[in-house]
Curated annotation (Swiss-Prot):
This is Aspartate--tRNA(Asp) ligase. It comes from Pyrococcus furiosus (strain ATCC 43587 / DSM 3638 / JCM 8422 / Vc1). It is found in: Cytoplasm. The gene is aspS. The record marks 85 as: Important for tRNA discrimination. It comes from the Archaea. Mg(2+) 3 binds at residue 361. It is an enzyme of class 6 (ligase). Residues 192-195 are annotated as: Aspartate. Its cofactor is Mg(2+). Mg(2+) 2 binds at residues 361, 364. Its main location: cytoplasm. One of its GO terms (cellular component) is cytosol.
Amino acid sequence: MLRTHYSNEITEELNGKRVKVAGWVQEVKDLGGIKFVWIRDREGIVQITAPKKKVSEEIFKLIPKLNSEDVVVVEGIVNFTPKAKLGFEIIPEKFEILNRTQTPLPLDPTGKVKAELDTRLDNRFIDLRNPKVMAIFKIRSNVFRAIREFFYNEGFIEIHTPKIIATATEGGTELFPIKYFENDAFLAQSPQLYKQIMMATGLDKVFETAPIFRAEEHNTTRHLNEAWSIDAEIAFIENEEEVMDVLENLVVYAINYVREHNERELKILEFELEEPKQPFPRVTYDKALEILSDLGKEIPWGEDIDTEGEKLLGKYMSENEGVELYFIYKYPSEAKPFYIMKYDEKPEICRAFDLEYRGIEISSGGQREHRYEVLLEQIKEKGLNPESFEFYLKAFKYGMPPHGGFGLGAERLIMRMLNIGNIREVILFPRDRKRLIP
């Protein structure tokens, strides 16, 4: 390898030892008889100090010719000294330019010169050199790591379902059509039907992390047309509240994992991530509408709570209950998909729930209808053709246990966790209504 150490691996035990560091030139300072170079790598900054009397003439002449963002590798001796900004410096013995950068740069990777979001996204490879941007994606990586760890610890089995499908998951029109040889097909908007089929196999508890595709024309700070979904399905449940328990514990596990393993990144972002308060409050749909009505926001019974309503409710729960995460459940059946189980004693209400985080829905789930005849009728009630769902319905004919699950939006979870205002900030190459490149 071209480097022996990242910047954060240089400790006092290495004082007087030879190391090799590599990265991008962040800053050069020429004070005549002494020259400085600050090199940035994935983990931080390294100071290279080149006194004329201690380095070769070749290195001394090379340093002033460096440009910001040149890629370099430096071999030298570590010197811990209070005179260095970072507490240590490297006196270079070898200094190699691996690649020159063109100038001017399309944006400033330090973030000192502000750039529009579109400019940043068009040049994402430079944007990520900004420590604050990189911190987001290090946290994202650990969120996915924590999620997998949680599921495996809880006895879940990881599955991978098709992303090219023949029919709509929920009967909607918000699908991206594609040509599949002589057939018409679509990009999957959810693994919903497939993870439910898995409940008839005996696997009992499954999860998947994968992209989903939704042809919604929303162009907002909270919508993407390609996003990552964290899906789970659990067999042999008694009711939807058991699924809510799993989702709550998953989200808490992920947040606390970031708190423990991303202290440096949170410090870079100047953000204090608080431990979630448990248990998450569980607010019925009717109660949510009552709260909103008291706040001057009227929503007709049976309709979804809109963006404004979510924000108002989020503010109310924060100010009055001191919580950022809470469930809304017991929704009107007409507001939820065909596969959600209704209450037998009150069929206008169903066993669905949403998880809200700081006024944004980050997850939906519920107990599913596992009884074949009832499910068939619910498909018809939604105006859908059962023949389009034959592959799915077949699994319900031969022994389908009671089950439930959820889908959790990874980007929404991360943007709310870090209190970031635009969902495009937390995915590398966003796909939205107007962005297809890069």
